[in-house]
Amino acid sequence: MASRFWTQNSDSESEEEEVSDLEDDIPLGGEGGGALPSKYLQGDSDSDESDDQGPRMVRSAKDKRFDELVQTTEQMKNYMKINDWVQLQESFERLNKQLEKVNRVTESVTAPRIYIKALVMLEDFLNATLVNKDAKKKMSPSNAKSLNYMKQKLKKNNKLFEADIEKFRANPESEVEDEIDEDDEDAESADGFSDDDIVERTMNSDEEDEEQEDDGGGWTSAEKKPKEMFPKMDPGQISWEMVDKKLKEIIVARGRKGTDRAEQVEQLSYLARCAKTPAQKLEVMVHVVSAQFDVNPSLNTHMPIAVWKKCVQNVLVILDILAQYPNIKMDETSEPEAENETEKGADYEGSIHVWGNMVAFLERIDDELFKSLQCIDPHTKDYVERLRDEPLFMTLAQNVQAYVERLGDMRAAARVALRRVEHVYYKPQEVYEAMRKLSELQSRVGGAAAEIVAGEDGEEKDGEAVMKASTETKGPAPFVLTPEIVPRRPSFPSVNRKLMDQLVTLIYKHGDERTRARAMLCDIYQHAISDEFYTARDLLLMSHLQESVMNMDISTQILFNRAMAQLGLCAFRESLVTEAHNCLSELYAGGRVKELLAQGVSQSRYHEKNPEQEKLERRRQMPFHMHINLELLEAVHLITAMLLEVPNMASSVHDMKRKMISKPFRRLLDINEKQMFTGPPENVRDHVMAATRALSKGDWKKAVEVIQSMDVWRLLGQRESIMEMLQEKLQEEALRTYIFTYSPYFESLSLDQLMVMFGLPEAQVHSIVSKMMIAEELHASWDQPTRCVVTHNMEPTRLQALASQFAEKLNVLVESNEKAFDARTGGGGLEGLGRRNKEGQDYADAAGGRRGGDFGGNRSGFRNNRGGRGGRDNQAGGRGARDNQGGFNNYNRGNQGRSGYNSGYQSTRYQDAYSSAGRTPYQAGPASGINNRGVQQADAGGRMVSLSRVGSNRF
Amino acid sequence: MVDRRAEVVGRLKVLEESAAPLISFLQNPALVQELRSDQQYNLQMLQERYQIGSDQIEALYQYAKFQFECGNYSGASDYLYQYRTLCTNSERSISALWGKLACEILMQNWDVATEEVNRLKETIDSKSFASPLSQLQQRTWLMHWSLFIFFNHDNGKNGIIDLFFSERYLNAIQTNAHHLLRYLVTAVIVNKRRRNVIKELIKVIQQERYTYSDPVTEFLECLYVNYDFEGAQQKLRECEEVIVSDFFLGKQLSENGFVTIPLRDEFMENARLFIFETYCRIHQCIDIGMLSQKLNMNYDDAARWIANLIRNARLDAKIDSKMGTVVMGTQSPNIYEQIIEKTKVLGQRSYALTSNLILTSAAVTASAAQ
């Protein structure tokens, strides 16, 4: 027996957390039959020192607190011996403080055995002293004063622990003999309870009462505290006024330094049971909920899960009350102390106002859930357990939404709907299905449990608590019974799209701008993961979110980034390479993907973050289950970049001015090429680089092999089709690269040979080559009778290419000379120079993007890069223009008023895209690109003229 | 039926009565002369001199509507015209415009109808609608109705391109009525002078491909996106069927007992030309035999057709009759020319710069001297 105990004990001590778990249970562990935790603890700490358990001196905070208690008790014994009441009084006060500390650490309300023992000792001694009148007379005045003080104090104090004391008196010695056995039992029973259970029980004194009483009835302790509020009074005699007064008292104490938050919750929930009228109960419940929110004061840590669950239940009760008495109104505007409205009984007809805001509660609860998911390690079981609470939240949200809709407050309903959307949007159908099944299962279990106890207990409890609850309730029965009115299980439509549509439509109709924008992004995300690229894209473009998102808060921007990432993945699955690249390239442009998606923090070499920023960032992180797989994302980004960039590089060996499509990709490639030795590919980048090398030689087979050997593909659903798509794309791009690279060295290329080389059907080869001819990328033409491509060898020789480059540089030189001259003579100093410089660049852009390779290369490269981001942005421009000028944008869900988006937003982000139009196949509106360019050119041209006029006029 | 008739007649009577004063007023040309362009004045005048108030005007509208429903389109058209001059309610005036347009279309007065379309278009564009959505709807409707006119009016093919390609209407097509693309594409193909819009059209087609495609749009796509000539041929055949079965496109004209579908012939001819042109652009040497097959002509016809094209300077090519091939001339920019072009202006610019510089420095020294 003993050995078992010790081994267990040592186990627990080797792991800090478990220690605390075990220790938590100690005061409660005695339920079994009057165990003596204090002795146990003493033994425990003794064992640390005396036994050869090894050199471990790790002791939890609880141990220390208990030790302190023990010490103080010892001191008191000494003081008693010398009859020093002054010291005794001090010690007593210290003891009480320590008790508080102990209770806080163990999160329990029961007093440890040792405390009771000290009290008993003290009482006995006090009585003895009082009886002994001689001794009293002999005392010094200060001592006598202390004695009197103690007399009163102790009387008051002991009332709290009356029951405990009595029990202790009943069997004061038992502990010594049974110590080991008891301890063993303790340890065992401690194992039996999970942490959650314990905390939950301690959090709610009502249930605790019941449990303890039915557990054998012996162990009653300090948790009678709340009752002390109405001392010696049968709960039935408590009047409305008393409750009201008490409530006010508690509220006033709220937020004060010395107030114990957990205790406040208890007091309030006790009050809730005593409440006389539904309205009062409601009022108290509201305060209970806010007090529960207060339990966790820090922004960074989350609310204890048990408290969270309780809180949800409480809010449900509030909803019950509200549903049962529709005349009770809850709003924030009503003065809490205005009149004694809550006195009116259940049969009162008129409207009663109670202060409170359901939506705020709901949002807070959601935030706490989110935070707890952020904090819990995603690889533990806790995390999964926590995720299971999501349906519970969904239920609550659903009910709150129903309530708010009943009130007709559609704006609030939209807010609630958004919360629900944010719990659903990232779930693919399968995950959603799982959640639905889970919630059904849970409600079935809960329902069964509720049936069992339904007859005996009208109280609100969640399924778990009900099952454990006793058959007889000795605690004061609540005066206001609230039957379960609002449904306790969420109703999920079978397809998540349906739920989304339903909620999103509501939000579009009634939400404010931010809510709508967020809902829209969620909608886009949802469409993207269900492979509806075009719907998602159109939603994005028509809402003009990409222009306005820069002005929104950070979490919305993160959502936007997430939506873009999913859109990119979706485009990739639909084999739309350019679109996929356009979606993703921006995310990867800065190399801060993790931060942009809020999936972790990347260390930046260049600027240190201060702790404040880090904290903020941590608060923004997405919980693990919402993450987008970064490896997959990177793979898709690099592959799309490769498919676009390799032929592009091949086509522009000689001229430097050709734009880069993907800068990060180029950089990677450069790094890779500098390596002396290249090993076999290991990570995503290596794979893509290896494929790039193969592809640039036209060796598509190897490229396909390398790409397909990546393990990220197992994350994709329809793997086969995507592999096929990739192969086809690689073949095509290999063909293009091959032609670009080697056509200058051929007089003619046979169609049949190309077909064989790249494994493509004739029509496709013909189409690809024809396209290149039409785009004047390839200077060649078909010779139809012989089925071959005849090259015209228009590729300039090296000398010619250099000459051409030289000419261009001269051009730039002259231009900069002119600019310098203008800056000098035109006046306006540096500012003017900067401005004009910019205009000049615009001009150069407009004039055909003719800019030197090296001169100002950095900047121009960047601009080119951005401008050339291509399809998506330009298309956005096109569509944007179309809507802006049309003055309407409808999305046939009937969300009018979204036109608010398109006015007034000057997006710097996409300006470049606007001005570099006409390069992509997307240009929708004729005005957007071509006219823009024309206008700009004319404008810039005009300015040039006027500048020179200024110059000449001066003389 | 008899009941219905009685009911209708009864209603007619009632409406006629209520609108009578105004109608009698309007039927008197001398009195109509008195109306001026100022609407307020008109209303006031009517009110004072003829006791015609807003009730009567409203009745006129109802009466016109009733006339329209009874099939008396010319009457309805007249009344609606008059009504518009008097109407103050903008909603109603738009309804009146629509009514007028409907009357004209039903009476097949294409010229007048075109005017009406333009008027309606102006109103729709200028009017600030309560919601963009309804504006969009109005636009879409307008485009649908205008199909009647454009495919019957002589100048309709131009008109349709003008209307549909104007920014806002193109947007409306893209958002609301993809099927209208077919008519736009047909009009563009048939219209020789409007080649320039084809690129844009292709962009639109590609953009909307995921929601709408039919043989006509696919034809263009095959030809200009995929350069798939076989596919284009195939689509062309499908196009023929589509055109014949389409209400607007397949309008039949019977002359001397022959039934012809003018649009189809035109379309086929132009489409063939398109194919050939594109084909020539990427080929250096084409076998006439093969070409004639593709163009559904016999060898000689094809040769003649090509010769004609060459003569009309539409094609830079020569026929090699011995080999039976067409040899394209190639034109490619000379690299030397390019460089000369680039550097030509540089000298001038530098010269201007230096002279400016000298002038400035002279001015500066002059001012310093002063």
Q: Positions of the model-derived regions?
A:
Chain B
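Charged, E/D/K/R/S-rich low-complexity terminal regions of large eukaryotic assembly subunits
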Residues: 1-94, 98-370
